[in-house]
């Protein structure tokens, strides 16, 4: 399922979206390549090769989450991002850490289902076309009549004609499930029962729609008929175990310092619950059991108050690769504004173009934006590249508000305009603390 890249290619791909942080990119690139290397092995040694989990250390807004997210997208692997602070020790009210793996399985099933849908799309389209023809001419029409209508259908001559179609009734698919007390991971509820009875009874509903709009629901309906649900689940469980990536953010918030009590005990409990998950255990899900031995865990934290050594020694040992991400400089912020494929500058220019407004942001304006962001990060709170979004919104506030009334016009944003928009706020510490 995963796409294979060399470490150099992975870093090159990440460079398209993330500025700097070479060490972090190299570490995740090697970790991803090692998964492919492991899968080329055979026999006992393949089971013995464990993923080298990663701990990213660095201030907020420097690219920790983005690196992990882009990596998973690049690999086509199941990926889940969680915050360590959202979980509680087993026995306390709240989410337990095994929910991470259950969420990962759900994501894997969605990935596999989409892949399988693409594989049967052509066949589903043919079947959907036959059903549209049946709705137009009936089941008893002669082959000549069907062929005549098929030509008209493909030419788009019948797009606006209204027909009635019969599709599966999926209205109960979003019904809730419930955990069975005393059996973590085992679930039973309305959804499971409706699945059982839905398949036996083949519940359908009649929809009145145009020929053009009928194709999508019919293709979806036909795709579902062609999919083997058991095969999807088995493949999803396999890629979860071998290709899954779990990103645990804010792990520094559950690190306990000496002398802590009360809440610190619960935080230590979360760490202890994470230990078997990271080391390798079996988690029960409603689709089957998942071995976590070969799931890659990437943890990250700013470690402003605590330090990595405040984590439980056992957990530190299970995060062997340490990567420190650097705080962003003015040059980094300037590059973030302009270089990535979907940089902030390109995003705002594209947004204004939808209103037929031509937006030009000069080089000196970009320098000034980076200057202001660096200054605010230094004086108030260092939130990294996220500060650029705050400053950009403030600068373009007036242009965004009046854009619908000024179609066909051009706006030029230079250094003077930037200073006029945020200069006074940026220089007033009390105001900038609240507004920027």
Swiss-Prot record:
Statement: the UniProt record of this protein carries the keyword ATP-binding: yes
UniProt cross-references to CDD domains, sorted A to Z: RecA-like_HslU
Name of the protein in question: ATP-dependent protease ATPase subunit HslU
Protein's cellular compartments: Cytoplasm
Purpose of the protein: ATPase subunit of a proteasome-like degradation complex; this subunit has chaperone activity. The binding of ATP and its subsequent hydrolysis by HslU are essential for unfolding of protein substrates subsequently hydrolyzed by HslV. HslU recognizes the N-terminal part of its protein substrates and unfolds these before they are guided to HslV for hydrolysis.
Single GO term (MF): peptidase activity
One Pfam match: ClpB_D2-small
Residue numbers binding ATP: 19, 61-66, 249, 314, 386
Gene: hslU
GO cellular component terms given for this protein: HslUV protease complex
Lineage of the organism: Bacteria, Pseudomonadati, Pseudomonadota, Alphaproteobacteria, Hyphomicrobiales
InterPro entries hit by this protein: AAA+_ATPase, ATP-dep_Clp_protease_ClpX, ATPase_AAA_core, Clp_ATPase_C, HslU, P-loop_NTPase
Known partners and oligomeric status: A double ring-shaped homohexamer of HslV is capped on each side by a ring-shaped HslU homohexamer. The assembly of the HslU/HslV complex is dependent on binding of ATP.
This protein's UniProt keywords: ATP-binding, Chaperone, Cytoplasm, Nucleotide-binding, Stress response
Stated family: Belongs to the ClpX chaperone family. HslU subfamily.
Any single biological process term in GO: proteolysis involved in protein catabolic process
Protein species of origin: Bartonella bacilliformis (strain ATCC 35685 / KC583 / Herrer 020/F12,63)
